[in-house]
A protein has these predicted regions:
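Amphipathic alpha-helical segments that form well-ordered structural scaffolds
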Residues: 89-96, 182, 228-239, 440-448, ...
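Beta1-alpha1 glycine-rich phosphate/pyrophosphate-binding loop at the start
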Residues: 1-3, 37, 41, 45-85, ...
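N-terminal glycine-rich phosphate/pyrophosphate-binding loop and immediately adjacent elements
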Residues: 13, 19-149
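Short, glycine/acidic-rich hinge or "gate" loops at secondary-structure transitions
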Residues: 104-112, 246, 533-543
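Helical element adjacent to the flavin cofactor pocket in flavoenzyme catalytic cores
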Residues: 203-285, 289-291, 303-304, 309-311, ...
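Extreme N-terminal leader/targeting segments of oxidoreductases
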Residues: 1-25, 43-51, 69, 551, ...
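Rossmann-like flavin
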Residues: 100-207, 219-220
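C-terminal segments that line or cap access tunnels to active or ligand-binding sites in enzymes
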Residues: 206-221, 283-285, 290-520, 526-540
């Protein structure tokens, strides 16, 4: 497997891999990583669909990319997906997955046209005082110490950031900047999250720094992620004969070390309450989704708080399977699940879905986001963060294009919200969010959008239906780590198995994204089948001096470098440097970026 960039490789069709007709594939998990692996086995590996078996414990494909309606409790959306135009593997996949809504076009075409006609951007990024615009005004408000620390982090080698927290590398003044408000709530980072992962994010999205304050860098699907992404991919695979088997609870993959080779020899699973096994030979390929950020999700509804009695450090079937596999490694080459699943107090947050058709509530929504949620177009354009809830729940909420579900009533609006501090009292509801019913969560949200307090209880009870989801491991992949804590997609010496998903290690890319999961799926197939076509590299904006200069301009709030907070000595040095580059292409680059006039 090798990486490539440019259209030469991306437009080419690889030759059929040697002996692929003799091989079979077993994919554990139907999240984006597993479905993408199946896709590349079919399209580029040219493996017969009937040779591909995808195992799923639940009765629905999609893993964490879900969205569903419970006929008794209402709509559930655990989370949303923010997409980037340089998710290279994602778009390489969806350019060949047919739309299930519009005949004759691909999912990529559908998505591309939608976001061209209805581009995303926010008109109110944060609120204060119960629905007033916080006027962050696209400013980062970085002080000199914070800006210098971010620059240093950008350039620090990953090895030097292993097992370090963000708070270990950034100054206290950073937490009061708009940059941190945008960053924390958009990506769900915490102060104790991995400094290494924050560095990856800075490098990966340096080309989007101008779109960070108002989400203009983002693109969204038309419906929820299940209906817009998972379902078309499942239908594509089924049309090629791929067999997806539900109710398959995989407990272990037995791996034997034979000299320099590592060979998967058996899959252990439970089906219909009975433990069974599948014996494997070297031509049987196994793709293991190790770990899951939504494992042990706890659901609540309008009248019930989520039941957290089963939540404890390390508990969860995906972790149990990974631990069973990791225990077979001689030198830790299958990763260290305990690095990610051993502190649920650090890795949890909670989301809720509010369904309402109430006109008064919708008017209050419109007064904040300045758009009609029933227009079918972008509404909030990303989350609205309640800035004065920082010391409480730290609530953010959003309304994507409506309807979010094809089965949704045309007058209904679905609101998604989440809290980073699930163990603190709310500003209005004097309980921790994790202890609240859906109705109580809705009261807190209604309070923050400015509903009259005397109406809040009645509206939350009669005019809204709210479902909730507490996720103990949703931030598990943000835990401080070292490189060896996540197994390589294909470990050294592995003959017929790979690790895929958010807890497999692939260079440069960022977790908590659709692209990361899909990239591991593509890389695993290309490696095990030795497909002779390049995997598109992670977009290289961190190596593009134009993007870096442009990022500097926006980081200092669109000021020329002469207005940056420089000391006398630094200003004198700047004068000398600018004189040296006068009349060169460097001067032109500085002018194009806005750093000099």
């Amino acid at each position: 497997m090798y990486y490539s960039a440019g259209t030469y490789e991306s437009f080419a069709h690889p030759e059929k891999p040697k002996d692929v007709d003799k091989k079979s594939a077993y994919i554990i998990g139907t999240g984006l990583a597993g479905l993408t692996a199946a896709f590349y086995l079919v399209r580029d590996g040219q493996m017969k669909g009937e040779h591909i078996h995808v195992f799923e414990k639940l009765d629905l494909a999609g893993g964490s990319c879900d969205g569903r309606k419970d006929i008794t409790k209402g709509f559930f959306m655990r989370g949303g997906r923010e997409m980037d135009n340089h998710f290279e593997v994602m778009w390489d996949t969806f350019r060949d997955v047919p739309s299930i809504e519009t005949p004759g076009i691909s999912v990529l075409d559908e998505y591309y046209w939608l976001n061209k006609h209805d581009p995303n951007y926010s008109l109110c990024r944060a609120s204060v005082n119960r629905g007033e615009d916080a006027h962050t005004d696209k400013q980062f408000k970085l002080d000199k110490d914070s800006a210098m620390a971010l620059s240093k982090l950008f350039m620090t080698p990953e090895k030097d950031l292993e097992d370090k927290k963000i708070s270990d590398v950034l100054p206290d003044s950073f937490w009061n900047t708009n940059f941190w408000l945008y960053w924390q709530t958009m990506f769900a980072f915490q102060r104790w999250s991995s400094a290494l992962e924050m560095k990856r994010y800075l490098c990966r999205y340096v080309h989007h720094i101008d779109g960070l304050p108002d989400f203009s860098a983002l693109r969204f699907t038309k419906y929820n992620q299940y209906e817009s992404m998972i379902l078309p991919l499942v239908k594509y695979l089924e049309s090629h004969g791929v067999h997806i088997e539900y109710g398959m609870d995989v407990r272990n993959v037995i791996i034997e070390t034979e000299g320099d080779k590592k060979v998967a020899r058996q899959i252990v699973y439970v089906k219909d309450g009975r433990e069974q096994t599948i014996d494997l030979i070297e031509d049987d390929l196994v793709f293991i989704t190790n770990g899951c950020c939504t494992d042990t999700s706890c659901y609540g509804d309008q009248t019930h708080a989520p039941d957290l009695s089963g939540v404890k450090n390390g508990a969860g079937e995906s972790w149990d399977m990974w631990k069973a596999v990791a225990a077979q490694a001689e030198h830790g080459e299958y990763g260290n699940p305990d690095a990610f699943c051993s502190d649920v107090d650090a890795t949890n947050w909670m989301s809720a879905t509010v369904a309402t058709s109430n006109e008064e509530i919708i008017r209050h929504i419109m007064s904040i986001c300045k758009r009609d949620p029933r227009s079918g177009k972008v509404t909030t354009g990303g989350i609205v963060t309640v800035k004065d809830s920082t010391d409480n729940w730290y609530l953010s909420w959003t309304i994507n294009r409506q309807p979010q579900f094809k089965s949704q009533d045309k007058n209904m609006v679905l609101v998604w919200l989440y809290s980073l501090n699930t163990n603190r009292e709310g500003n209005y509801v004097k309980k921790a969010m994790r202890d609240c019913t859906g109705e109580e969560v809705c009261r807190e949200w209604l309070y923050h959008i400015g509903m009259p307090t005397e109406k809040i209880h009645a509206l939350a009870h009669d005019a809204c239906n709210t479902t909730t989801c507490f996720m103990p491991y949703i931030n598990a992949f943000f835990q401080p780590r070292k490189e060896s804590d996540r197994p390589k997609v294909v470990p050294d010496g592995a003959v017929n198995f790979a690790f895929i998903g958010q807890f497999a290690e692939t260079p440069r890319d960022t977790i908590f994204t659709t692209e990361y999961s899909m990239r591991t799926g593509m890389e695993s197939v290309y490696t095990l089948l030795d497909i002779d076509r390049g995997v598109p590299e992670v977009w290289g904006s961190k190596y593009d001096v134009r993007e870096i200069l442009r990022a500097c301009y926006y980081a200092i709030d669109k000021k020329p470098i002469s207005q940056a907070p420089l000391s006398f000595k630094e200003r004198e040095m700047l004068k000398v440097l600018l004189k040296k580059v006068k009349g060169t292409d460097i001067e032109l680059l500085l002018k194009e970026s806005g750093l000099i006039k």
